[in-house]
Amino acid sequence: MEVNYFNQYKEETTQFEVILETVFKDIKEEKSMQVIFVDNDQIRDINKMYRNIDKPTDVISFPNDDEKDDSLGDIFISIDQAKIQALDYGHTLEREIGFLAVHGYLHLLGYDHHTEAEEKEMFTLQEEILNKANLKR
């Protein structure tokens, strides 16, 4: 799958792009997607504008509804929030970025976690993809 990266974060993000290339390399998908790296202020603005929630979050996905377009959609990842969560969960920042990207990707495909069954299905798929990329907990 083709992934296009856009860095709107204050630091270099090439190392995360390399990791995500490994994560998504074996996924057979005809459509591309965009991953945009942002900070907490930027994702807070996006969260407020589109979800009416005035606080930062870790990842937000926007599926592309235009069937003529060859893009699944856009995934915004807050590097600031990923750093906090990696410390909280006791794993690497690389693993957290991978998790957030896969989580966002599955949302673009229509997966969700509103019910216990949906959450189990989504999180099982996430772990399978991350384990293949050797980003285990």
From Swiss-Prot:
Which cofactors go with this protein?
Answer: Zn(2+)
Cofactor stoichiometry and binding remark: Binds 1 zinc ion.
Going by the UniProt record, its keywords in alphabetical order are: Cytoplasm, Endonuclease, Hydrolase, Metal-binding, Nuclease, Ribosome biogenesis, rRNA processing, Zinc
Q: Where in the cell is it found?
A: Cytoplasm
> Its domain of life?
Bacteria
Principal subcellular localization: cytoplasm
| Enzyme nomenclature, EC number | 3.1.-.-
Pfam families, per this entry?
Answer: YbeY (PF02130)
Which InterPro entries does the record match to this protein? MetalPrtase_cat_dom_sf_prd, YbeY, YbeY_CS
Q: Which GO terms describe its cellular component?
A: cytoplasm
Q: Does the keyword Lipoprotein apply?
A: no
Q: Which is an annotated GO molecular function term of this record? A: metalloendopeptidase activity
Question: So where does Zn(2+) get bound?
Answer: H103, H107, H113
One BP annotation, GO = rRNA processing
- What this chain does, per the record? Single strand-specific metallo-endoribonuclease involved in late-stage 70S ribosome quality control and in maturation of the 3' terminus of the 16S rRNA.
Report the sequence similarity comment from the record.
Belongs to the endoribonuclease YbeY family.
For this protein, the record's NCBIfam families field holds: rRNA maturation RNase YbeY
Protein name (Swiss-Prot/TrEMBL): Endoribonuclease YbeY
Its source organism is Acholeplasma laidlawii (strain PG-8A)
Q: What is the lineage of its organism?
A: Bacteria, Bacillati, Mycoplasmatota, Mollicutes, Acholeplasmatales
The record's gene field reads: ybeY
